Amino acid sequence: NPTTGSVINFTSAHNIYIDENGIAYIFGLKNNGTWVANRGAVFLDVAANATDPVYLGEWADEYIHDGMVRGDTMYAGCIYQGELYIVDVSDKSNPQTIGQHTTPNNFTHNAWVSDDGNYVFTTDEQSDAYIAAYDISDVNNIQEVDRIQSNPGSNSIPHNTHVDGNFLITSYYRDGTTVHDITYPNYMIQVAYYDSYTGSGDGFDGCWGTYPFLSSGNIISSDRNSNNGKGVLNIYGRAFQQACYLQGNIYDGFTGSPIANANMEILTTTNSETSNLLGYYQSAIVDSG
């Protein structure tokens, strides 16, 4: 029990996140290959002295594989529970779970919150899995609003996703680095990708990490196993732009009533959408304009 002066011994961890206040959140602890009992998240203050961090507390309700923190809220991928957990960490000595939700493939790898704090995006580290978006404006009633695959039917595996403004940038193993426009989180659209691995399908080769927050605007992505069997660091410029969205309502010209199940097509594209019960439709194409 660290509060009585003893220490938490660990020799490795799956991931670490350091927030804007210099608090390190250590996820998935092991000690010489054995899981540490309190392996959810350990909170350490590394701001004053990174070589002699101060223990602040821990959250040990479930195993956390990966997570991030903004302000007083932790967003955690509890992979073996297959759930997104949202935790109030304002009191590091007594963190409290305030919301949770299952993810599409029940193997929640990571989570990242939108800039406005109203949405969270998750990945499931499974074959043919999804990136998913959730409305968390009410943490007591979290709602999935969209899910998307980079290459449907290919069995590729998403790994880590990051929100960068209106874009979602994801390491996607054998599908490389993918970029989705999330201007409308309920209608994500892929606008760019670079596949650094020649193979396809199920497997843990190719891109397994990406970082889009450099001041240069460049994106760095790491391949754990490139085409020659070695790791590679890739640096990408930003040659992508936001998608073009089309949305509206269809009404009966005589009665003014909404028309459901009306088919809407964007000419010269394969896009086809059907209006809902309120006559609403939404579509998008990659090309801006």
Language model: regions and residue ranges:
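Detector for glycine-centered tight turns/loop "hinges" at secondary-structure junctions
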Residues: G22, G217, T255-G256, G279
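Feature marking well-ordered beta-strand scaffolds used for ligand recognition
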Residues: N1-Q242
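Short, ordered, surface-exposed loop/turn motifs in non-cytosolic proteins
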Residues: L246, G253-T268
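Phosphate/pyrophosphate-recognition segments in soluble nucleotide-handling domains
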Residues: Y236-I250, A260, V286
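Short, acidic Ser/Thr/Gly-rich low-complexity loop/linker segments typical of extracellular
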Residues: P258, I266-V286
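Exposed beta-strand face motif in extracellular beta-rich ectodomains
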Residues: G289
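Short, solvent-exposed loop/edge segments of extracellular or virion-exposed proteins
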Residues: N151, Y197, N249-T255
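Hydrophobic aliphatic residue packing
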Residues: V163, S221, I250, A262-M264, ...
